[in-house]
Structures are given as C-alpha cells and as structure tokens.
Amino acid sequence: MQYGNLTTVLLLRNTLLSLNSSSICHVHWLQVIVALLVLIVCIFLYWRTPTGINAPFAGYRSPWEPPLLVQMRYVFNAASMIREGYAKWKDSLFQISRYDGDILIVPPRYLDDLHNKSQEELSAIYGLIRNFGGSYSGITLLGENDVGIRALQTKITPNLAKLCDDIRDEFQYCLDTDFPACRDWTSVSVHPLFLKAVERITHRIFVGLPLCRNPQWVQATSKHAHYATMIQIAMRSVPKFIQPLLNFCLPWPWKNAACVREAKNALILEMQRRRNLEKVNSFDYIKSNDLLQAVMEMSSPSHEDSQLDVVAQIMLTMNTIAGHSTAASGAHALFDMVSHSKYIELLREEALQVFRHVELRVTKQALGDLRKLDSFLRESQRHNPLSLLGFFRVVLDPAGITLQDGTHVPYNTLLCVAPHAISNDPDVIEDPTSFNGLRYYEQRCRDASQEKKHQYATTDKSHLHFGYGTWACPGRFLASDMLKVILTMLLLQYDIRSPERAKRPVAGHFHEFPLFNINTPLLMKRRNDSLVL
C-alpha cells in the first residue's frame, strides 16, 4: 500500500470539502494563507513519488505515518526496519523508505536471475554510487570509467601469488614504523592499527614503491578517504532538497578537494617518472607489478596530460573504496578472538604448522592452507557485517526488467538484498546466534565436494556480505590475503588480551552501517618466542 500518497489525497479532499462547505467571502485572507501552509506541509510530509512496484513497506508504525518521519527514523533504526521486513516478507519483495528514495529488498531466490542481467540492464556500479550518496559520493567516476575495477579483477587478483611478499613486507614495515614496542602489556587501539596497516598495504599494491611510503601521498589519500566518507554519511542523513545547501556549508568538501589536488600531484609525478624511465631504458626497464601500472596500460589513449589526470582520479577513487571496510573486518576479527580466547592458541598453532612447512615464507598456498583462520574470518563477518544491506543494483533499462516469476521492476529502481538477516536466519544457518569460529572449516572437512566452498572470499546465497556473482566485491580476494597476513603476524609476534572488566565493543547502527567505538583498546605484548615471517 502507498501509505503516503493515499493520506495526501484524503487530506486534499477534506480541505476542499471544508472550503466548499463555507462561504469563501467570510474567510479572512490570513486564514486562507494558514490553511494553504498547513496543506503544503501535509503534502511535504506525506507525498511519495510512486515506485510502480507492488510490494509492502517495512518500518511504518501506522498507515497514517508520514514517509518523511519514516525516512528520519531509518537513520538510527535501519536495523529494526530491515529485521521487521525480513521477518514478515523474507520470501518476497518489500520496500524501505530512505531520504535518497525507496529501496526494494529482494529474497535470495531472485539472485541468479538478477546477476545474469547485463550491466546495461541492471548496474552494480551505479548501485554502489547511488547507495553512497550519488553525485556527492566521490566515486561517480566509476560510472564513466570502470578501468580501475577491471584492472583489479584481471591484473591484480590473478597475480596475488606474486604480491604475497609485498603484503608481508609492508605490514612488517607498519609494525616497525607505526606500532608501539609492546615490550610489556601495552594498550593499543585496534581499529586505527588495522586502518594504518590496510592503508599501507593497499598503497603498496596500488601504487608500489617508492610512492606508497611518500608522506605527502599517504597523508593526502588518508584524509581524502576520511572526508569522502564523512560527506557520504552527511548527505545520506538529510532529504535531497537540503543536500546542496549542506554541501555548501560543510567544511569537508573543500578540505577534500585540497587533498585530491595534493594526492593527484604526487601521483602524476610518479606516472611521469615511470614513462620517462620506460623511454630512456626501454629494454632494461622493469615495469611495476601494481594497480597503477595496470590502469596506465589499460587506459584508452588520449592527450597525455589529460590521461594522467584521469588515471590519477581513477586511482584516488579506487583508494576511497578500498581501505575502511577491510580494516573494520580485521578489527572485528581480533575482538572476536579475544572475546572467544580459545581460538587464539588454536589459530596460532595452525599458523605455526603451515608456515614452518614452507620455511616461514608467505606464499599464496600457505595462506590458502590457513583453513581455520579463513573459517574464523567468515564467521566473524557473519556476526559483524560491514553493512546490513548488499548486492546493490540500479535498473538502467528504460523499460525496466522482468524477473523469472513475471515481477516487473521499473527503471531507476534501487534494489538490494539483506545479507545479515539471511545469514542469521535459522532456516538458512544452523544455530545462527552462536559464534562458531570453525563452522565453515567443519563444513569443508565433512564433505569433499565442499572443499572449495564456504571460504571467506567466496559467495553463495547464504553468505552475501561480498555480494554475489560476477560483480561481487572485486577486492575480496586481496582483502582476504591482507587479513590473513596481518592476523597471522600479530598472533605469531604478540600475546593479545582484553583489559580487565572490558567487554567487546557493541555495534550500534547508523543507516545500514554498524558502528562501534573505533578507539576501543586491547592489551598487546611482544612474545618472548615471537616468530617473524
């Protein structure tokens, strides 16, 4: 039912009947103005653009509740709205009202049909852009030029085996440079540690040495990602008509622009350096094995200066979407290890066994053999998702799309799934409320046909936190390797525990994003028998 539009029509009818039943001649002009203002306010509160979709709305407390109030409540009560919708309509479509428009939540049974649609019909990239603030997201370039994503998929992911040493080397550099000595029990804020580590490793994989350790580049890109995130959150938190004014008043947009200029200058100098070296030493020059080199080679030829600028913007856009989610996943995993301390020694023993077998070298095969850690990461992600919603898509076909059962989804609809609700459904996951760090390890061991399934970076209809199908998160394999290296090196070099009487940080929610106190500390101490990979 379209609650808002029905209410608006009733209010209009009652107002007109009231005016018709009285003599207009006896109505004071001030009363007319007040009545019109009341009418305008009611229309503003209750009007909703029809979606053309026959699906119920979750989150309404009554048919008379104004859509604007529901949209306001979504900012802080998205979790309960999504939970309510899934409980009532988990096998069918339902909708939720947000400031940026209504979104359609679909059940897993539609996923095969949806992910087989072409990007011209149903776009994953535009779904990502729309969900992160549209024109204010800072990632709109992805909709015009997807070379960064294609380079990550085709050049980086297939060559991760060659990048394992770089990941290990950069995290050890982070420990030596950014980490306290921890000779005795030392309080360490976990999330900032992971964010710094993930940023450093990402820079190494994306732009390589020496730029990845250039203070100008590191500081500018870190601030850029922070400001872009703040802008996205701010714009998602107000109605659309307020966004231009808010964007003008906030300090983050102009601070972000300054960071972009500084980062692009550093990146353009690096690209010019590489091109000059290639021209001078065309036979002896060894090209860098990083994302920047891949993007430079895959970019369409154009005017040199403009191409450098475009490539720089592509790299900054990729950097914006790369770091924070992986850092949060790592922090949650470490908190879960400490909260369920029996896993610390179990995972440490697995790491010792695996890496002693390969003479303490970090290899792709060794990371793949960390099956218990892989299971633990997947279970931690199930309990601590980075978003309550996922698999965002926008219908681009002007005629809309028709699903396998005949359901029609109109043009410009933003649709998604509810991964957290699905992976905590007792009909989908056995005993979903308990934390079993070996849940997926045991599933892989029980059935030989499941050996390649149920891994942290794989997706299926019961675990959709990375998306599903061809356009699932393109960086998930890199993120998996990063987290395994970071967590393994921490376990082998440090003892870790929580402060006395401290509890695991409890996540609240802002929109569909779980939030926790990022400064929550753990106690860490260098092990006497620490093992350096």
Curated annotation (Swiss-Prot):
Keyword Heme among UniProt keywords: yes
Taxon lineage: Eukaryota, Fungi, Dikarya, Ascomycota, Pezizomycotina
The protein's role, per its UniProt record: Cytochrome P450 monooxygenase; part of the gene clusters that mediates the biosynthesis of lolitrems, indole-diterpene mycotoxins that are potent tremorgens in mammals, and are synthesized by clavicipitaceous fungal endophytes in association with their grass hosts. The geranylgeranyl diphosphate (GGPP) synthase ltmG is proposed to catalyze the first step in lolitrem biosynthesis. LtmG catalyzes a series of iterative condensations of isopentenyl diphosphate (IPP) with dimethylallyl diphosphate (DMAPP), geranyl diphosphate (GPP), and farnesyl diphosphate (FPP), to form GGPP.
GO molecular function, one term: iron ion binding
Localization in the cell: Membrane
Binding residues annotated for heme, in chain numbering: 473
Family (UniProt): Belongs to the cytochrome P450 family.
EC number assigned by the record: 1.-.-.-
Pathway: Secondary metabolite biosynthesis
Top-rank taxon: Eukaryota
GO biological process: secondary metabolic process
GN (gene name): ltmK
Recorded GO CC terms: membrane
Transmembrane domains' residue ranges: 27-47
Name of this protein: Cytochrome P450 monooxygenase ltmK
Cited Pfam families: p450
Deletion consequences: Does not produce lolitrem B and terpendole C, but accumulates lolitrem E and two other paspalanes, IDT522 and IDT538.
Residues glycosylated per entry: 116, 528
